[in-house]
C-alpha cells in the first residue's frame, strides 16, 4: 500500500523563507482515537457539534452555509507494526462553512503534529491513497517546506490549501480536485494538492496557477506537478510533468 507522502525526489520544490510572499480505514472522531494516538488528535468534534446545536436556536442553524461538496478529514500516524491502511483514521465529515471552521478550530494545527503524521482532506467517496479509482489517473502539485518554516508558514499554507478546496477556488476545474495532504516529517514537511486527471494539461495548469497565487508564493519560485503513476514507480530521477 502506498503512503500519501511524496519525498526525496530530485525535482521537488523547497519553499524557503525568502520565497514566501506573504474500505479498511476505520471511522473515528477525536474521542474515538485509541489512547496511544490521542495526544496527536485532541478534542472531541462530535461533542463540539452537539454543543453547538444545543446552544443555537433552529433559526440560526437553518442559516448554515452549505458547501458544494461533502468533505472528509483523515488523520494518519505512522506505525510500522501495523498495515498502512490501519494507520489511517477517518476523523469527521462536513458540508457547511460553519462545520469546516468548527473542525479546524478543534484539531491540532499541522505544525503541532508529531513527525510521521499526516492530515488529509478529500471529497467524500475518495480515499487519500493512489489506488483509489478517482486518484489512479491523477497526480499532485507538490510543495516541500523547509523545516525552519514549520512554525511560521506551514499552518498558513495548509489553511489556505483547505480554503481553496472547500471554497471551490479552482473555478470549473474544481471538479478535478480530489483533496490535499500535509505530511509532517523530520527534515521537510510537504503539502500536496491532488487532482484526478494528470493528462488534462489545461485543467492541471489552471489549478496550479490559481493554487500558487492563492498561497502567495513568489513568481520566481517554480512548483511542480507529478503524476501518481510516476511517483509510484519511485524513480530517483522523477521529473515534474508540469510546472508553474
UniProtKB/Swiss-Prot annotation:
Residues binding mRNA, per UniProt: 84-85, 130-131, 185-190, 233-235
Pfam families: IF4E
Classification via PROSITE patterns: IF4E
EIF4EBP1/2/3 binding as annotated region, ranges: 65-68, 101-105, 160-167
Start-end of Basic and acidic residues biased regions: 1-26
Any GO molecular function: translation initiation factor activity
Domain of life of the native organism: Eukaryota
Classification via InterPro entries: TIF_eIF4e-like, TIF_eIF_4E, TIF_eIF_4E_CS
Stretch list, region Disordered: 1-57
GO CC annotations on file: cytoplasm
UniProt entry keywords in alphabetical sequence: Initiation factor, Protein biosynthesis, RNA-binding
Subunit structure: EIF4F is a multi-subunit complex, the composition of which varies with external and internal environmental conditions. It is composed of at least EIF4A, EIF4E and EIF4G.
Family as reported in the entry's similarity comment: Belongs to the eukaryotic initiation factor 4E family.
Function in brief: Recognizes and binds the 7-methylguanosine-containing mRNA cap during an early step in the initiation of protein synthesis and facilitates ribosome binding by inducing the unwinding of the mRNAs secondary structures.
UniProt-recorded name of the protein: Eukaryotic translation initiation factor 4E type 1B
